[in-house]
């Protein structure tokens, strides 16, 4: 009787132990996909950041040539040298 209980408990421990450890194949696949996505996301973010910087500079800073020409057309001395 004790022999049957012991074998049942031993089988339960072995099954629980093997289920608790993750397989390495699944982790490698997830890491590879995660690295791939993370790499593309950072590159896209950097590109969008550069585009935004250039766009904001163009909007905020007026063109010097246009300011010089408009000042000359009005007969004023341009303040930009």
From Swiss-Prot:
Keywords from the named record: Antibiotic, Antimicrobial, Cleavage on pair of basic residues, Secreted, Signal, Vasoactive
Domain of life: Eukaryota
GO cellular component annotations of the record: extracellular region
Annotated compartments: Secreted
GO biological process: antimicrobial peptide biosynthetic process; blood vessel diameter maintenance; defense response to bacterium; innate immune response
Signal peptide residue numbers: 1-20
Propeptide segment residues: 21-37, 65-73
Reported tissue expression: XPF is synthesized in the stomach and stored in a novel granular multinucleated cell in the gastric mucosa, it is stored as active, processed peptides in large granules within the granular gland secretions of the skin.
General function of this protein: Xenopsin is a neurotensin-like octapeptide. XPF has antimicrobial activity.
Family designation: Belongs to the gastrin/cholecystokinin family. Magainin subfamily.
Name this protein carries in UniProt: Xenopsin peptides
Organism: Xenopus laevis (African clawed frog)
